[in-house]
Amino acid sequence: MQRYRQLSQLDKEAGGILIGRILLENENFIIDDTSEPMPTDTRKRYRFIRTPEGHQEYFNNIWQKAEGRCFYLGEWHTHPERIPTPSSIDKKDWMRILKLDFESDILFFLIVGTKEIKVWYGQKKNKRIVELPRRD
């Protein structure tokens, strides 16, 4: 994800999906992998639209290698700002994703800024999205 930071004025937003595990013993989440931008994605300076093509195949490949022991855990994308904040479009998209059917009640949303990565999580049952506090 870091290699897609928008450090120059010409860099376009990038993004992908988060893939990982949910530990049964403590319900902790581990993000093991991420997809990278695909040729079918829309990438502009201030907009990224992920298409299913490519990302789904990438997930399927990881799922087979993990013998079905991995899950879709959310989305990531970049912003051309030092400390990223979600746009109204981001928030709407996250709420739309939360309404879809996934194994987990919680999904994660990462935005990679030029200096920091910020993380939010959303819960299906209460339809809330909350920023995870940064631990230094």
PLM region spans:
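Conserved beta-strand-loop surface patch within small alpha/beta domains used
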Residues: 1-72, 81-136
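Histidine-centered divalent metal-coordination motifs
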Residues: 77-79
